[in-house]
């Protein structure tokens, strides 16, 4: 680091070199102006080292600031009851496991176990809840002469041809009209929701049904059915849960499982 020093120089008066003088002329000295001279001086090594250290610290500060501005920080979002994702990494959904069958795919709740029980004709898959077998999912594949699911008619008409999917009650016989059931009837089914999406060029029927039986202790069962036709086969995925568990979280697993059902 350089510094400057200034010096003020004074010049002595000067007189003409001639020796001839006349009495009528007075000697007037010639005065030159003072000069201010500034000379650059090199500071000591200590100043240089201090300057170098300051420069390095300044460069490092600028570098860190630039890196912070240029870095994209993902928000640490978290839902209630979940840990914050402080590093911005994508979280893996561990609630479901992918399953690939013969010509179809779906997601199955991770805590459900495979079951050997065969409940429906053409059943190729069954998983059930570890703690409540009422909550389960099954896939059936049966031959059909239909070219499309729409050949069965409306979703309601299709459901009437596969009403065995809704289960059977333990009692049958003459009954009085009570508990909301018709006379001589111990079971009832109500269609709650119907949709007809097209996925991968294939028409699907998605039907949500609530059934109640006189011998049931769950207050009813929620059934969600997804069905389609391809290559001369009728594919049906049905998941269900008891009414009590439905409102305690089972709804998420039942609906997500049937929604994920996809036929190749």
UniProtKB/Swiss-Prot annotation:
One MF term in the entry's GO annotations: calcium ion binding
Disulfide bond annotation, renumbered to this chain: none
GO biological process: photosynthesis
Ribosomal protein among keywords: no
One Pfam family named in its UniProt record: PsbP
Transit peptide: 1-78
This protein's UniProt keywords: Chloroplast, Membrane, Photosynthesis, Photosystem II, Plastid, Thylakoid, Transit peptide
Compartmental location: Plastid, Chloroplast thylakoid membrane
Keyword Chloroplast: yes
A cellular component annotation (GO) from this entry: chloroplast thylakoid membrane
Protein family: Belongs to the PsbP family.
Function: May be involved in the regulation of photosystem II.
Protein name: Oxygen-evolving enhancer protein 2, chloroplastic
Gene: PSBP
């Amino acid at each position: 680091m350089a510094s400057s020093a200034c010096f003020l120089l004074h010049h002595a008066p000067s007189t003409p070199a001639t020796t001839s003088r006349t009495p009528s002329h007075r000697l007037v000295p010639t005065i030159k102006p003072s000069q201010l001279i500034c000379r650059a001086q090199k500071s000591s090594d200590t100043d240089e080292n201090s300057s170098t250290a300051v420069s390095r610290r300044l460069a490092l500060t600028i570098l860190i600031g630039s890196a912070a501005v240029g870095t994209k920080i993902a928000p640490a979002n978290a839902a209630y009851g979940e840990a914050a994702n402080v590093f911005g990494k994508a979280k893996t959904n561990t609630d479901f496991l992918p399953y690939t069958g013969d010509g179809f795919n779906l997601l199955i709740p991770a805590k459900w176990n495979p079951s050997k029980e065969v409940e429906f004709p053409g059943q190729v898959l069954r998983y059930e809840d570890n703690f409540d077998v009422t909550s389960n999912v099954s896939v059936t594949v049966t031959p059909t002469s239909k070219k499309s699911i729409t050949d069965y008619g409306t979703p309601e008409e299709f459901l009437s041809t596969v009403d065995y999917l809704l289960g059977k009650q333990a009692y049958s016989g003459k009954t009085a009209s009570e508990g909301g059931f018709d006379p001589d009837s111990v079971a009832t089914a109500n269609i709650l929701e119907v949709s007809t999406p097209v996925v991968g060029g294939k028409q699907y029927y998605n039907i949500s049904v609530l059934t109640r039986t006189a011998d049931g202790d769950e207050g009813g069962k929620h059934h969600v059915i997804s069905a389609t036709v391809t290559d001369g086969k009728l594919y049906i995925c049905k998941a269900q849960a008891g009414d009590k568990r439905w409102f305690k979280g089972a709804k998420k697993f039942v609906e997500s499982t049937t929604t994920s059902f996809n036929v190749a």
